[in-house]
Structures are given as C-alpha cells and as structure tokens.
Amino acid sequence: ANCVKNGVKIILTSGRSRREAMDFQMAIGASPCIISSNGASAYDAECNREIYNERIEPDVLLGLIDYARRNGHTVKLNYGDSLIMNKAAYDDEKPLETSYDVLEHVAREEQVVQCVVNDTDFEKMKIFREYVKNEYNGLDIANESKRFKNPDLKPSKRYYCDVASDKVSKGHAVKAVCEYFGFTADEIITIGDGENDVSMFKQTPNSVAMGNALPMIKEKASFVTTSNDEDGVAKVLERLY
C-alpha cells in the first residue's frame, strides 16, 4: 500500500484471464494495470485502454475447439475482459458456461488471446499437448500443469494447457507496458517463480526470483528473495519504502 501511495506501480502478471486477474488485483490493492493470459494481453483499467493484445488466429482456434469437442476436453476462451467455457469445472464457473456454437462464434469474431484446454485424464491431456506441438505452427503452450514435465508429482484433479500465439510471453508484455508508461529497464523490478516468468527477468537488471522457484529459475534472476510462504514479494517492496 505504501508503494502505491508513493507512486510505484505494482502490476500483476498472471496466467489467468483478464477478468480473473482484475478480481485478484483489486483484492490485493495492486495498480489498475493488468498483464494477463501469460502475457497475451496488457490492459490499463484506469483509462480503459488496451496496451498489448496478441490474438490467436481464428482458423487455428477453430481447429483447437473442434479437437477438444471430439475428445471431450473442457475449453475456456479468454478475450477482452470476458471468459467463457463449454463446461464448468467448479460451481463459481457455472455462469460462464456456453455452447460450442457460441465458442466457435467468439473464435471468429473476437480477439481471443488464450485458449485453456483441460481434462481430468492425464494421458488424454498428454496427447493433446503433443497434438498442439506437432500440428500447429504459430502456437505455443504458454503454461501447463507441472506434472507434464515432472511425472513423479502427485496427481491432480485436473490437468491444463494454456495455449496462445507463439509470439506471446510475459517479457513481451512487460516491454509493451514499459513503453506505454515510459519506464526504462533500470526503473522496473520483475518478480516471479515460474518458467514463464524468465522472459520478464530479461527485461531488467532488477529481476527477482522467489525462494520457492526451481534452481534453474533462480539462476536466471539477478536476485533471490524468500518464498511465497515467507512474504518474499513484500520483502522486496519493503526495500523500496
């Protein structure tokens, strides 16, 4: 709170949709600027202005929806400040449910920046993951369930892949936000704990990895703070004010 009062912008970067990220941003009192969908979108909520937006090509997106439909996967589409899906996994998602026809209409007509595909079946999602990698140029899995790369992890209730344009990264979005506000690389700090945060680290000499990050992530950052459980982000911000 002291940082925001003193003019420091605390900008949330999230794999969530803009709608979900803005709810979280308001809850924690961060600045009204959001990088969402793993960097596919950046938005200034104060001015209601799109800063950066990287759309998935409609034909490609329609192919993903068709594959998910044939294989019984759940599909979520992130666009603007909206989020829709064919099947809710949780009760609070019920109002977001819609038909495949509506999903296909949105794929054609809206600026969809991220398609989240998920399922309870780990093996089926492994096949989907390979399908995306082998069948589509111009697409990338921006984020995914950790068990895909570490099969020894405890099973989850659901497994997901966040699919976006291969031009998307949190680093690109951070760069766009810096240009928008007129920040230099020396004037920002980036903080993260995941593989998809490394691209942000490259945007500034002031990069910070969380204490709970994997060793390979910590090696990419200039500094390391304590873990999430030990208020690692707060400790970085306290050094500013």
Task: Give residue spans per PLM region.
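Short, structured coil segments at secondary-structure junctions
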Residues: I28-A30, N38, E46, Y136, ...
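Active-site phosphate-binding/coordination module
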Residues: A1-E93
